[in-house]
């Protein structure tokens, strides 16, 4: 963050990147895949596919993933989403059982893994960075509640933009790929919880957080 210059410039750049990411996700809430709503457990009749890499999912190539299933009757259920930390003991996707299993390696190649998270397909990371800026401003070494209040306002603007661009109708471009949509509770927790925690002793911060949540 320090490489971006002044705090005001940093927050403005992060906010703009976040808005672009959230608008893109609002228009493709499941990255173009079929909504996977019951995602708390492994679907029946599927096998788990585990990664060989350790790191954060930076990007999922949905076009390439869908093409791999063009002439294949099976379906893919994405467990990992952009921003997920993965390792070889954690399944990144479930695959409908079939005769040929060699496709698993090709499927894994569509999931780009990096050492760090990226804004590209990861709206939650955008909120986490915004919250981090606010928390740094609230640290005893900085003690700048004004910046934290400014960031809270920006966070509310990001979430409002996301809500305004969401559509009740989801366009499914890749019906063989099932993706869980973002959960509103997760978004609120990503942004507001750290700020509320670090600003617990400041009345003005708590008021802003409560107003933002309302």
Annotate the PLM regions.
Residues 98:
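Short, Lys/Arg-rich nucleic-acid/phosphate-binding segment
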Residues 2-77, 81, 90-94, 102-214:
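Short basic (Lys/Arg) and small-residue
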């Amino acid at each position: 963050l320090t490489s971006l210059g002044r705090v005001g410039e940093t927050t403005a750049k992060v906010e703009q990147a976040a808005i672009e990411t959230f608008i893109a996700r609002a228009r493709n809430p499941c990255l173009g895949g079929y909504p996977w709503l019951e995602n708390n457990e492994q679907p029946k009749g599927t096998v788990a596919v585990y990664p060989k890499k350790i790191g954060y999912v930076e990007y999922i190539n949905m076009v390439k993933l869908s093409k791999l299933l063009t002439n294949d009757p099976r379906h893919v259920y994405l467990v990992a989403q952009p921003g997920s930390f993965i390792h070889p003991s954690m399944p990144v996707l479930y695959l409908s059982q079939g005769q040929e299993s060699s496709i698993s390696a090709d499927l894994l190649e569509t999931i780009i893994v990096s050492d760090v998270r990226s804004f590209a397909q990861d709206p939650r990371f955008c909120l986490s960075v915004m919250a981090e800026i606010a928390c740094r401003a609230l640290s005893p070494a900085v003690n700048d509640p004004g910046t934290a209040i400014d960031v809270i306002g920006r966070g509310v603007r990001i979430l409002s933009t996301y809500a305004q661009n969401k559509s009740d109708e989801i366009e499914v471009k890749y019906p063989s790929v099932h993706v869980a949509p973002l959960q509103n509770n997760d978004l609120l927790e990503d942004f507001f919880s750290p700020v509320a925690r670090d600003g617990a002793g400041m009345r003005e911060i708590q008021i802003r957080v409560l107003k933002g949540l309302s």
